[in-house]
Amino acid sequence: MFKIIKKSIEWGGRALSLETGKIARQAHGSVVVNYGDTSVLVTVVRKKKEESVDFLPLNVQFIAKSYAMGKIPGGFFKREGKPSDRETLISRVIDRSIRPLFPEGFHDEISVVCNLLTYDTVNPPEVPALIGAVAALAISGVPFHFTIAGVMVGCDENNNYILNPSVQEMKASSLDLFLSGDENSILMVESEVKELSEENVFNAIKFGHEHLKPVIKLIKEFADTIGNKPESFAPIDASDITQELEKYGKDFEKAYSQTVKQERVQALEAIRENILNTLKETGKDEKLITYAVKNFERSLVREIIRKKSVRIDGRKHDEIRQIEVEVDILSKTHGSALFTRGNTQALVVTALGTTQDEQIVDDIEGDRREHFMLHYNFPSFAVGETSAARAPGRREIGHGKLAWKAIHPVLPDKSEFPYTIRVVSEILESDGSSSMATVCGTSLALMDTGVPIKAPVAGIAMGLIKDKDEYVILSDILGDEDYLGDMDFKVAGTSEGVTALQMDMKISGISFEIVEKSLEQAKAGRLHILEKMNAVISEHSDDVKDHAPRMLSFYIDKDKISAAIGSKGKNIRSVCERSNAKIEIGDDGKVSVFATSGTEAEIAKSMMIDSITELEQGSIVDVKVVRIEKSIVELEFLNGRKGKMHISEVANEHIDSIESVLKQDDTFKALVIDFEKGGCPKLSRRRVDQETGEFFEGELYNEERKDGPNDRDNYYNNSFSRKPGGSHHKRPPRPHSGFSNRNRPKFGNNDSSSGFY
């Protein structure tokens, strides 16, 4: 029933196999790729183009369902919903690798679906998914005449490169590099780097490319065995129209010389509309005219740049647009920056939060928490267009993740800066390199916020104009240069090294020479941008803004964690409610306190310490009146514990009633005199100097007792002495806290203990 064809090799210490003929046989191309114990099913389906389509409707989807990891989806709905960010990013990597390899003018609809069948949580699925996509295209009959492969590269602590590192190896790696290419050239690069030099990054690319060759050979042998050759595709012939367009060359050249984007766009649209109306009258097809005009413009601009060494806006090939930098422009945010480069502008805003604000990510490796989030928004008005607001698309997710990768290596360790950080980049204008403007703006906004980043980060987008062996590398490309050029190579980093890379091609690949020179030229541009940024702000603020949440942390004994939390969270909830703060307790005993002010944070800290500390006779505590009876006052500690005080201990003088001195909700300092059998503290107000908060050393008023034999005698049935040798009575023994009230550190004015509800 099945005609199975399978090819395999040993690659990177693991078996890599391609198999077809058993699964998904109705697709035009179907391949199961196994790498280690990770398996991906890739299918390709082709649909003949619609008449109105004048672009390549390529749709790439990577799908990772939870069964592949042996899990059931969490939450109320037990079925997968919209694609995760990880799925979207893998889909983009595959799309960017294969899209440039389809012939120009081929507009059939192509669907590439990569289903993760099983995942061993060791071998990431990106590599087998791309390999499977290329293999499935190669056997589908689609006019796809190039054979490429993908590879991941890591770098260990000894600067040794790792081929296809495991998930665990990648966690300790200073490099996370994914690249694709054929035997002779590089096609796509995506990377996060921990400030490695351009030389190290270039060598990593060469290392990865060298290990692509066995896989490319495997795919070719696999396709040859099946024998379904790609069909030929004749390019569109619009030579007769192109000849008629020559007379519009000067008009296009003048329009493209406009440095203001809006003026340039208006001038170009006027010329195109004139050409379309003129040639339609001669009977020419509208789609053919549009196709010919596009190619004519592309050839014209590329020739001007290559031969005259002058770019669209008059800059030299390595010149950066004018840069304007502002910080702290939004008064009530935790940090903000406005970064403008030419006609590209990013408003970047930061917000600080607690661990409770972290993003819980349901990833294929399992749930994890992200304390740094970067969200990129690209509204339609940024390019002068109208469009309804919608959820972030693939492009916005991809650009945001690239900026995240650029900034992530310079963020402080969470133990140093425990805030959760959210960054939002609003692109207000765009004429190329908006993702790199986001990188620059994020670095500025974080420093304005007071985040102790290791170094400022800047980003730049490099372009390429290539004609056979001649080429020109462009720094800080415009949107039109991206559209008409051959490469979009984004490089971000500090003055010391690279932190992120992303390279996309519109041709079938570039040489190592171009890659190396692009990295060198990008470094010069990056240093120039950093100089402009550092002139405004070069170091992080000493502290977070006044209206930002205040944070402090301290440690408690691990055996006190349960007491600090309390039964069903009663203690920590009580402290949070009373102090107006947020408190988080880690498994290691670390307590993080977040409050709107430093004073509130200190109060919460003191209350938490008090709630787990032994309360002893002689302690001076803060209390509040909660109920007044005839001769007894019921008091409450700041952490919620209750105590009692007799009328004779209210004032150092005779009083007829408690209400003459105290009323409901009054607060004061009291001395712990003794404990009832049940552990309830007996308190005294008159034995504390209310101005200094210290033990009252003066003479105490002593009148003849007028209470009955079962009143005061039963309540204060023991004498109290501050002197050594005095009769100090404690409540029933409890587990020791590690502190004594006399010797423990002074955490605040609240030296009480609680934890008993």
Curated annotation (Swiss-Prot):
Coiled coil: none annotated. Its cofactor is Mg(2+). Residues 702-714 have a biased composition (Basic and acidic residues). Mg(2+) binds at residues 482, 488. The keyword Cytoplasm applies. Residues 549-608 form the KH domain. Its EC number is 2.7.7.8. PROSITE patterns: KH_TYPE_1, S1. Residues 618-686 form the S1 motif domain. It is found in: Cytoplasm. GO terms for molecular function: 3'-5'-RNA exonuclease activity; magnesium ion binding; polyribonucleotide nucleotidyltransferase activity; RNA binding. SMART domains: KH (SM00322), S1 (SM00316). One of its GO terms (biological process) is RNA processing. GO terms for cellular component: cytosol. Residues 725-734 have a biased composition (Basic residues). InterPro entries: ExoRNase_PH_dom1, ExoRNase_PH_dom2, ExoRNase_PH_dom2_sf, KH_dom, KH_dom_type_1, KH_dom_type_1_sf, NA-bd_OB-fold, PNPase. Residues 698-757 are annotated as: Disordered. Belongs to the polyribonucleotide nucleotidyltransferase family. PANTHER family: POLYRIBONUCLEOTIDE NUCLEOTIDYLTRANSFERASE, POLYRIBONUCLEOTIDE NUCLEOTIDYLTRANSFERASE 1, MITOCHONDRIAL. Involved in mRNA degradation. Catalyzes the phosphorolysis of single-stranded polyribonucleotides processively in the 3'- to 5'-direction. This is Polyribonucleotide nucleotidyltransferase. It comes from Wolbachia pipientis wMel.
